[in-house]
């Protein structure tokens, strides 16, 4: 596992006990993805990547009472937390797994899915191809990820100060579709913007830390403490602190 992947796993593993208290937006997005999946397919075998504490896991098992689900996460503590939190008996298995290197037989699953996990992939195009290969013909690859306008308030505040925040560059919906594996049809592709309200900018940063998502972009230089304080003051000066989540949702069906 690369140093970057180890870093991601450590951050999310450490956040397992605090994740649910701060993950309001993430929980909503997971439920909406499960609803979208249930509208187009009835899977018997499901693989979930980036399961976290189990928001999508629980929603899927509620929709599909006869399905079996394998919940995986790059951070083994997250996968273990999911298994304990979601009471599904033998219907649910959990394991540590890098979603970019899936360790299952090809053609095994009816549904492969993940909510707000793909933005952590180093090579999403290759990852989607590898995950798609695990599907039977007619199976669905479904995911949500972050889009271009995510945390735009933070970017704007930094730009006013001549600073570059270490926020990843996220794709547009069209750019995400360019990463669709060959042989897959678009069942659904949409975007929405959700807003996470905070009393101040520091509370926003602390919420990211609580869910393990406070890592800078890969190869980006973190802001100095002084620069970070300047951005915090700039955001607070706007008088209304909110964080935009630009959410991309795609459901692709294998021919």
Predicted regions span which residues?
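A short glycine-rich, Lys/Arg-flanked "PGG" loop and its adjoining helix->strand segment in the class I
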Residues: 125-137
């Amino acid at each position: 596992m690369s140093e970057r992947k180890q870093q991601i796993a450590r951050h999310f593993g450490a956040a397992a006990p605090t994740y649910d208290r701060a993950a309001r937006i993430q929980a909503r997005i997971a439920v909406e993805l499960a609803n979208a999946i249930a509208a187009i397919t009835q899977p018997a075998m499901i693989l979930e990547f980036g399961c976290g504490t189990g928001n999508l896991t629980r929603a899927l098992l509620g929709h599909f009472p006869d399905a079996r689900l394998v919940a995986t996460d790059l951070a083994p503590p997250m996968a273990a937390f999911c298994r304990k939190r979601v009471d599904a008996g033998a219907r649910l298995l959990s394991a540590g797994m890098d979603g970019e290197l899936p360790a299952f037989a090809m053609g095994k699953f009816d549904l492969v899915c993940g909510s707000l996990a793909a933005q952590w992939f180093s090579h999403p195009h290759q990852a989607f191809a590898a995950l798609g290969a695990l599907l039977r013909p007619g199976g669905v690859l479904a995911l949500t990820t972050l889009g271009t306008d995510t945390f735009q308030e933070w970017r704007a505040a930094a730009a006013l100060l001549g600073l570059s925040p270490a926020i990843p560059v996220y794709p547009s919906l069209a750019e995400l579709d360019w990463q669709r594996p060959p042989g897959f049809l678009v069942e659904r592709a949409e975007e929405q913007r959700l807003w996470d309200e905070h009393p101040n900018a520091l509370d926003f940063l602390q919420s990211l830390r609580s869910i393990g998502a406070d890592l800078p972009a890969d190869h980006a230089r973190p802001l100095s403490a002084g620069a970070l304080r300047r951005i915090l003051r700039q955001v607070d000066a706007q008088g209304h602190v909110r964080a935009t989540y630009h959410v991309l949702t795609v459901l692709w069906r294998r021919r």
